[in-house]
Each structure stands twice: as structure tokens, then as C-alpha cells.
Amino acid sequence: MTDVPVSRIRNFSIIAHIDHGKSTLADRLLQTTGTVADREMKEQFLDNMELERERGITIKLQAARMAYQASDKEDYVLNLIDTPGHVDFSYEVSRSLAACEGALLVVDASQGVEAQTLANVYLAIEHDLEIIPVLNKIDLPGAEPDRVKQEIEEIVGLDCSGAILASAKTGIGIAEILESIVHLVPPPEDTTQEPLRALIFDSYYDLYRGVVVYFRVMDGTVKKGDRVRLMASGKEYDVDELGVLSPTQVQVDELHAGEVGYFAAAIKAVEDARVGDTITLAKAQAAEPLPGYVEAKPMVFCGMFPTDADQFPDLRDALERLKLNDAALNYEPETSSAMGFGFRCGFLGLLHMEIVQERLEREYNLDLIITAPSVVYRITTLKGETLLIDNPSSLPDPQHREKIEEPFVQVDMITPEEYVGTLMELGQSRRGTFKDMKYLTPGRTTLVYELPLAEVVTDFFDQMKSRSRGYASMEYHLIGYRENPLVKLDILINADPVDSLAAIVHRDKAYYTGRALVSKLRELIPRHQFKIPIQAAIGAKVIASESIPALRKDVLAKCYGGDVSRKRKLLEKQKAGKKRMKSVGRVDVPQEAFMAVLRITDE
């Protein structure tokens, strides 16, 4: 199984935008090389999470080893390392590219280059990978291979004269792709004699074996039973099981430089074997780890609360289990006066947040209330201390802080030119600064904006898609923190601030947001027995208010005629009762009210 010389190993990945046919192409490669028998074949073979198949995206990385006999009658081993295509998971992409020597750049021949593909191609170029352009879906009636070739040449600067025309669905061009992987992708360097260094590019939690780590051996050899050390976390483990992914797991006794495989070593949590960490032998350690390890930092935060307070322990267990599989997920307990006990969770981006929420609800049967997403603000206090705050309710008062800075991102949008106007409006309305605009090919344009991340995390992506009828695509990356006149907007219901409705907003937008919020809450909160004032305030200054009138019983119904003082006495008595009720009564804020905060920005 592992006696193939290094010169006949090829490690490659597939770079493609969502829906450009990456998973189908991977299926065809597995089928053509006979790695997966036809009867076991199912659509999207490598996307084995139910959610991935449903959304048609790749979330967790997969790897597969294929044996292939090339036209020169030699047997080769091709290791496909699958990458997630979504912008939230770009760190995972960079690690899996670091484990390869080549990449297939798959572009839909009817759509052309999209923004996410660009971001990943630039990562591949940084890692010095050999890039093979493949134009997929050429069987579609709308395919324009010549236009797309020109587009790739102009945007990415790759020579497309040898681009492969393929259709993963019908199997056209698959043999050519396999041949070009063998002939164009360089073999790994033969460094079997060096001390062991292996790069972790993925890990997942298995109920019986603990964490199973996927890795690529860069230097040296690893054998079953070796004691290994993970350089970033400093932990040591014994390798109980070692194997290759074909794409199901097949055990082997040793793996040498250039190979891709997995090992299990009774590791308790994925945090101990983080993506990007370097594996080395405990007794013969490598001098330095492989470059490029970064701890994935959450960018978007939100509160998660169970609708039923009794489900709090279940939510905690569910988060612990997801955390085993997802080192980028952060959470800590928090309490809210309105919603009881819950967790403050951190995510890589909006898609990551949605996926975690959906997995909690689907796999663990939880009903959750999610607060509005927020980002990490940097606050400098008057004493000169720097605080990082992800929850608006923990923002210090204005008299204690010198300045607030918020994270900014650069957003690159690629769009057909007829939507440029509406997308520029969108950029301006989100406090964006226009930076650049290039015409890629006739009819397609790229727009570059700098925006506060807070404006991107709410619903920027959805708005961009709806304004461009789904044709535009975007990618964003962090460019640093900038100072802005930000204020904390508090919502008071019956004179009590509701911490889960608080938000940090730009001063110029505060009145508009406050006004919109209170009028929305007025519609959503049901009437009570007493009058409920709803106010939006900045500090002690109320900037907008509405009130919900009381429900009242007609206490005069049984007075027929009679003295006016009798009626007055009954009305006074009712008034006193309402007053007492108002001072002790609690207002129930329904779940829809919290969701309203998320939607205010759309209107």
C-alpha cells in the first residue's frame, strides 16, 4: 500500500467557487481511478455531513488517496485534499493548500471566475503550487470556454492555452485531468531521512478513538506505535492507529515524506491537535515547526439561549461536542436578564455561525434564541488600557473610555456590469469607502470597498445577492481597526434596559436605528394589563420612544345611571391597581422581538 516511491506521489487540491462542480469532479476522479466501486458511489461522496449535501457546500475538509496507472504504464498515488470553498474557512483552505504541490482551478465555463475562487487562487500562488486550469460544465448550452479562458488569463494571469475542457457530470476530460496531474504537478521532495515533520490539515472527533488527525508528512517517517509531539500545543501522544484515506480509512504500518494519511492517538479534544500544527517525534524532535500556523480567531459573536431554560445543560453538552470537531468555535456562559442562562459564542464568519446554529437545532434537537451578531470592538480607556469587547452590554460608559475602534474589512465584489450601480449604493449605505473598480472582461467588473465588519456581518451578503439577482460574488478579509464615532444604543422596556437588545451603532445612524427599533417592538410586544413605554436611549438621553396602551376591563359596565362619584371611585380604584401592576409587572418580550433587531438594518 505504501511502497510507492516519492517520485510517483502527487498531492493536489481542487479550488472552485460554490456550485462550480468541485464535489462532482472529485466524485468522477474517485470513480475513474476505481477508488470507489460504482455500486458504492453516491453524489458528493466526500461531503459526508448531511448539512453539506443539503447546502451543496464543503465545510469540513476531506482527503482521498487514489491509485492510478498513467499512460506511461507506471502506477501513481494521487492524494486529493479537498478544500472548503467558502470565505469563512479560508484558514483551513490555506492549510490544505500547504499540504499540496498542485491545484486544479475549476471554473464553470458558463459563469466565469468568481470572487472566492480568486481569493483561493492567490493563496495557492503564495504556496507556489502548480495550477492546472479546468473549465467545467462545457456540456451546458450556455458554456463559453473561450471567454472564460480569456477571463482567467486577465484576472489571475495564468496561461490558459493548455486549459482542460471538462464536464464532471458526463465524464468528458476526466482522463486528461488525471494525466495532467501526473505530468504537471511536481512530486514531493524526498526528505525521508530528515527528522519527522508533518502538517495537520484537519481533525475530527470520533466517539471511540478520540480525535482522528489528518496530516501530510513533509519530512521523515512516522510509524505505528511512535510517540509523537504536537509542537504548538506541546502535547505528546502514542500513535495507536495509522492509515491512509482511500477515502474510507485503511490501516498501514508507516508513512514517509510526501504521503497523506491519518492517525488516532486517544487525543481528547480537537483543540489539542489544531489545524496547522506540526507533528514531530518526541525523541527526535525537529528543530522548528512548519511555518504558517495561526490560531483561528473568531470574528463574529452572538448570544445563544435555549427557549426552554431546562435545556441549558443540553445546550452546554451540544456545544462541547461541536467544539470537539470545530476548534474555531468559541463559547463562554453568559446570563441575560431577559433570556436567562445561555452562551456567548464566537465564529469565523456568518456562514460558520449559521452552520453551528443549524447543527445544534438539527442534530441535538434544541430550540434556540440567537441575539444579533456583533464583532470585536477595541476600546481604549482613559487610563490607557485596551479592552476587547464582543458584547455591547459590557461596553464601558462614555466617561470611562477614550475611543472605540471597530474592525474594517476589504470587500471585493465581482459582478456583471449592469448591477454596478445598485452594488455601489449598497456599499455607500453600509458606511463603505469606495477604493477601486476594474473592468475584467467586457461585461464583468470588480468593485473594491472598505467597510466596517459590523456592517458586513448582518446581511450584506444576502443584500448583495438580491440586488444582483444572484450573479455577484464577494470575498472579504480583515485590514485592521479604525476609530469611529460609535455609541451604545440601549432599549428600555417599561424603564428596564434589555441587555440582549442593546447594540453598538454609528452615531449618525443611532436615531434612525432607535426609531425603527422601538416602532418595530411596539408591533411585536403583546399588550399587557398596564401601559408599557418602549424607549431607545444613548446613555441617559432618550432618542425615541413609543408606548403600548394597556388592556383594560370596563369597570363601569354594571353601573346603571347612578351617581358620578360612584363611577369615579371605581375608575380611581382601577387606576391605582394599574399603577401598582406597572411597578411590579414583568413584560414578556417574545422571540420575534430579538429577531427584529437583526432585520432592522435591511429596511
From Swiss-Prot:
InterPro entries for the chain: EF-4, EFG_III/V, EFG_V-like, EFTu-like_2, G_TR_CS, GUFP, LepA_C_sf, LepA_CTD
Membrane association type: Peripheral membrane protein
Superkingdom: Bacteria
Task: Spell out the molecular function terms from Gene Ontology.
Answer: GTP binding; GTPase activity; ribosome binding
Q: Does the keyword Cell membrane apply?
A: yes
The positions annotated for binding GTP are D19, H20, G21, K22, S23, T24, N136, K137, I138, D139
Coiled-coil intervals: none
Q: Which SUPFAM superfamilies match?
A: EF-G C-terminal domain-like (SSF54980), P-loop containing nucleoside triphosphate hydrolases (SSF52540)
Which cysteines share a disulfide bond? none
Keywords linked to the UniProt accession? Cell inner membrane, Cell membrane, GTP-binding, Hydrolase, Membrane, Nucleotide-binding, Protein biosynthesis
Pinpoint the tr-type G domain residues.
Answer: 7-189
The chemistry this enzyme catalyses reads: GTP + H2O = GDP + phosphate + H(+)
Q: Which PROSITE patterns match?
A: G_TR_1, G_TR_2
Where located? Cell inner membrane
Q: According to its UniProt entry, what is the function of this protein?
A: Required for accurate and efficient protein synthesis under certain stress conditions. May act as a fidelity factor of the translation reaction, by catalyzing a one-codon backward translocation of tRNAs on improperly translocated ribosomes. Back-translocation proceeds from a post-translocation (POST) complex to a pre-translocation (PRE) complex, thus giving elongation factor G a second chance to translocate the tRNAs correctly. Binds to ribosomes in a GTP-dependent manner.
Q: What is this protein called?
A: Elongation factor 4
**What taxonomic lineage is listed for the species of origin?**
Bacteria, Bacillati, Cyanobacteriota, Cyanophyceae, Acaryochloridales
